[in-house]
Amino acid sequence: GILDTLKNLAKTAGKGALQGLVKMASCKLSGQC
């Protein structure tokens, strides 16, 4: 249903945001930005 679709979208968006934050943090820590 629509609710399940929205939940999946939120999960996917959350994962993407987390991955982006981790990438940014590790690149800043290693000085390879």
Curated annotation (Swiss-Prot):
Keywords: Amphibian defense peptide, Antibiotic, Antimicrobial, Cytolysis, Disulfide bond, Hemolysis, Secreted. Its main location: secreted. It is found in: Secreted. It comes from the Eukaryota. Pfam families: Antimicrobial_2 (PF08023). GO terms for biological process: defense response to bacterium; killing of cells of another organism. One of its GO terms (cellular component) is extracellular region. Disulfide bonds join C27-C33. The keyword Secreted applies. Expressed by the skin glands. Belongs to the frog skin active peptide (FSAP) family. Brevinin subfamily. Shows antibacterial activity against representative Gram-negative and Gram-positive bacterial species, and hemolytic activity. This is Brevinin-2Eb. It comes from Pelophylax lessonae (Pool frog).
